[in-house]
Amino acid sequence: MKEILYVKVRKCSKDDKVECFQIAETFKAKIIDYGKDSVLLEFVQTATKNDAVIKLMKEEFASIEVVRGGSVGIESISMMER
């Protein structure tokens, strides 16, 4: 089961942004928004992987905000069956 996790890195420098983009690429995250001094990332993965992301982000950056959305279930349907 996967869950949604949003991490906002605040008060980040240009080097911090580069690091955020590398983390996003490694964990297959989406960059939802970025500004002059912040980056917002969206992760959709298992709770265990999201725990690892949070731990890493806390170690790497001084100021982060975390929002977890809980488990997500997605059903696939075929349009041909309708």
Q: Which residue stretches match the model-derived regions?
A:
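Long, contiguous binding/interaction regions
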Residues: 1-82
